[in-house]
Design a protein with these regions (language model features):
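N-terminal helix-turn-helix
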Residues: 2-90, 221, 232, 236
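A short, hydrophobic, proline-anchored segment that marks a local hinge/packing element in signaling
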Residues: 191-199
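Short, structured helix-loop boundary elements
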Residues: 19-23, 76, 80, 93, ...
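A structural signal for short hydrophobic beta-strand segments in well-ordered beta-sheet cores
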Residues: 69-70, 117-118, 195
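Juxtadomain coupling helices with adjacent low-complexity linkers
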Residues: 165-170, 174-187, 202-242
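Residue-level recognition of short loop/turn positions
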Residues: 74, 122, 198-199
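Amphipathic alpha-helical effector-binding/dimerization core
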Residues: 78-164
Length: 242
């Protein structure tokens, strides 16, 4: 009889409340595949998902039947032809604005400060979407504005987590967010966190700005939560900061 795994399986750790265990196990198996590890053996799938080989074989049988997974002549497995078909359906219905703007509104509701989503545009950063704080004294989010990629909390995220050139003396943060007590001016403070796409590349930056006198470090958790949510919507994963 196989021994019980020392650690719970990924499906047990990420089980959906009230969901179907077999589906959780199958999805956890698919999550093992990455751009760097697109072809995996049975042993690798079992080890990475922390499931018994016998369980993995049964899951693979169903996944191969639906062309979600493909078995190759050398015995290794990869994602199958159903994946790009489903991706095409998803891409046809996906809207960046309808994904990001509601997340920004939730962030503003939680913090009562202004929130924005920045993307890189050459040597600059562009404010693509923004939602203003409901408070009278606030930092106005100017959608369409360009700023230096080396200034402010949002710019620092691009230099630290992307491939933009860092400012002299810049250091790698220990946490997946950046706080600047004085963002671009002394009067404005900001908290920013990276958003990643399905390839693991930096897709953009969530930034929360406020009058410097209202800066609260606790809002970093709200910013990070929003960045993680948008990352998930883009099919990405947050990297480990350890």
């Amino acid at each position: 009889m196989p021994r019980k795994a020392a650690q719970p399986s990924l499906s047990e750790q990420q089980a959906a409340p009230g969901g179907v265990g077999a589906v959780d196990r199958a999805i956890s198996l698919l999550d093992v595949f990455t751009p760097d590890r697109s072809m995996l053996t049975l042993a690798e799938l079992a080890e990475e998902s922390r499931q018994y080989k016998s369980t993995v074989l049964r899951l693979l049988a169903s996944l191969m039947h639906s062309h979600v997974v493909k078995r190759h002549a050398d015995g290794r497995f990869s994602l199958g032809s159903t994946i790009p078909r489903l991706h095409a359906v998803y891409a046809a219905s996906f809207s960046m604005e309808s994904t990001v703007v509601p997340a920004l509104r939730e962030l503003v509701d939680a913090t009562r400060e202004s929130a924005a989503y920045h993307i890189r545009q050459g040597a600059k950063r562009l404010c693509l979407y923004g939602v203003d704080s409901p408070q009278t004294i606030r930092d106005h989010t100017q959608v369409g504005a360009l700023a230096s990629i080396r200034s402010g909390a949002a710019g620092r995220v691009f230099t630290v987590f992307g491939n933009a050139p860092a400012a002299p003396g810049a250091r790698q943060p220990r946490e997946p967010f950046v706080i600047t007590p004085a963002d671009v001016t002394r009067e404005v403070a900001a908290i920013a966190a990276p958003v990643f796409d399905a390839t693991g590349a930096l897709a953009g930056v969530i930034a929360l700005t406020m009058p410097a006198m209202r800066l609260q470090r606790k809002h970093a958790a709200d910013v990070q939560r929003t960045a993680r949510k948008v990352t998930s919507e883009l099919g990405g994963r947050y990297p480990s900061m350890t």
